[in-house]
């Protein structure tokens, strides 16, 4: 792509070009000024603004066919990146190219749109319908309002529906895997702000720019970010403290606080520290500012202010807590069963900041699937039981995962890349508990 001539950029110099009027990014050590391409980008303006001022190699290669954008990018080449902010991966191997070609071929040969399936919209309707109906029942259906236990039941349903907002419209939108319309992605993403009170924008930094490119890499994947000391020890290279003993017996109970933690953390990330672990936050657009604060305000209004007009404070807090904890537990347990388990890998860069592993192979080796044969678990986890499939092809609708699984597993077998899968969710979660137990043990050198 382009010539070898041009200016050299350190990652700090690249980072300064991170606005709508001055937008640079790097791919495979080559820097591009895509400011004039911004309005023509098929993936929308927001996508490029998120990647502005950084090396987006793994993200770019996730969402584009190899070589497909070379002719376009050649026009915008301006120089070479000479230092790295985050870990760097080798050129794609034969395994990576083969698995990508085979899956892309599956869709083109059958003339199937990988981003569209009719059942997407039916599931969204069920999620939002059950959320609104369960909320309404808690406040306005006399038969329910007169029975606290029934209100709690509907609060549980509502909490589960809120979790499904995160696992379906939010998650699909953040990977551009539903329709080809960036406006649809923004609207679906905003449902997370309004119904869950948590930021779609922060999620994009954490998930799309952090977790997916750098899965399980300490210091780069925000999903496994920890403090020192931290309440839990999840990474092999993380320092052990005495409070980690028997962590498998108490840490999972803390997962019920996830939603509360995220809502507060959002504000800190966007407006104070301006980074999510190692993922820098770029200037915030007017749209995202309105969605962020509008979402926070709407969440407080519908979850607290409106209920207080009809129910006593104690009951409002009870129902709020029940729904929040159900949502938190479901999301946390689902996430942990995929990556924070005993058999996955925890890659680390070498002294030059290079991960000595093909990116696609790393995605498979840092991920655990489960319950492939269960349509129920596929439905209620947003297809995260096909997590390795999702990590390799995040821009493909989750409803296609079962159809391309055989291609992926066969290719992994052919190239001797171990594919980890458990028969049930409970086996997968047991692996998470065992991982906590082992890392909670006092190290021999202590």
Swiss-Prot record:
Transmembrane intervals: 125-145, 150-170
Keywords, ordered alphabetically: Electron transport, Fatty acid biosynthesis, Fatty acid metabolism, Heme, Iron, Lipid biosynthesis, Lipid metabolism, Membrane, Metal-binding, Oxidoreductase, Transmembrane, Transmembrane helix, Transport
Catalytic activity entry: an (8Z,11Z,14Z)-icosatrienoyl-containing glycerolipid + 2 Fe(II)-[cytochrome b5] + O2 + 2 H(+) = (5Z,8Z,11Z,14Z)-eicosatetraenoyl-containing glycerolipid + 2 Fe(III)-[cytochrome b5] + 2 H2O; an (8Z,11Z,14Z,17Z)-eicosatetraenoyl-containing glycerolipid + 2 Fe(II)-[cytochrome b5] + O2 + 2 H(+) = a (5Z,8Z,11Z,14Z,17Z)-eicosapentaenoyl-containing glycerolipid + 2 Fe(III)-[cytochrome b5] + 2 H2O
Xref: CDD domains: Delta6-FADS-like (cd03506)
Outcome (variant: residue 248 to H): In strain: ATCC 32221
EC number: 1.14.19.30
Gene3D superfamilies in the cross-refs: Cytochrome b5-like heme/steroid binding domain
Result after altering residue 111 to N: In strain: ATCC 32221
Motif (Histidine box-1): 171-175
Cofactor(s) in the UniProt record: Fe(2+)
Impact noted for substituting residue 88 to I: In strain: ATCC 32221
GO annotations of cellular component type: membrane
UniProt motif Histidine box-2: location: 207-212
PANTHER family the UniProt entry points to: DELTA(5) FATTY ACID DESATURASE C-RELATED (PTHR19353:SF19), FATTY ACID DESATURASE 2 (PTHR19353)
Protein name per its UniProtKB record: Acyl-lipid (8-3)-desaturase
Record organism: Mortierella alpina
